[in-house]
Design a protein with these regions (language model features):
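Bacterial N-terminal signal peptides that target proteins for export
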Residues: 1-8
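Short, linear, compositionally biased motifs with a strong N-terminal bias
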Residues: 10-13
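Sec-dependent signal peptide cleavage junction
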Residues: 19-41
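Amphipathic alpha-helical segments
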Residues: 29, 36-37, 50-132
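Amphipathic, charged alpha-helical segments and their helix-to-coil junctions
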Residues: 35-38, 42, 116-164
Length: 164
């Protein structure tokens, strides 16, 4: 139940990010970045709480898990930054009218590169997690991450218009 509530909050936040990408009139790097950072901080705190409540970690497991979790989130944030840059580029191109073929191809390749990096990152963290958690808890954590990511991607996909 707690995971469902968190996913609803996450979905709301995911819908807000593309609207920041389409903000016009504000000087680059001002209000829109501040708003995105506020959303990120809220999401980070909520996500950590949900993970904590759904992992049932022993004290020894928690001692090993949280540093790996924090490193994973830092790396995930770097990927999110790349994706947000791609979304902003798409919003700029979309707002100008029909997106040129070369621009569409470039943006598509950037988005696919982020997906490739995300999978590579997930694979690189499994052995790190296996050093501090039993296999079932590693699988559970990766399921939680995957479910959250799927909801975010679904909401982003629903809020970003198709190329024309």
């Amino acid at each position: 139940m707690k995971l469902v509530k968190f996913i609803l909050v996450l979905a709301t936040l995911a819908l807000a990010v593309p609207s920041f990408a389409q903000t016009k009139g504000a000087p680059k790097g001002t209000a829109d970045q501040a708003d995105v950072q506020i959303l990120r901080d809220k999401l980070k705190a909520d996500k950590k709480l949900v993970v904590s409540q759904n992992m049932s970690l022993t004290d020894a497991e928690a001692k090993g898990f949280w540093p790996v979790y924090d490193a994973y989130q830092k790396d995930l944030q770097a990927l999110n930054d790349k994706l947000l840059t791609t979304i902003k580029s798409y919003a700029d191109a979309y707002n100008k009218g029909a997106v040129a073929d070369d621009v569409a191809k470039k943006l598509m390749n950037e988005a696919l590169a982020v997906e490739d990096e995300e999978l590579k990152m997930k694979r690189s963290y499994v052995p790190k997690l296996e050093k501090v958690l039993p296999g079932a808890k590693v699988a559970r954590y990766m399921q939680i991450e995957s479910k959250i990511r799927a909801i975010v991607k679904m909401e982003l996909a629903a809020s970003i218009p198709l190329v024309y």
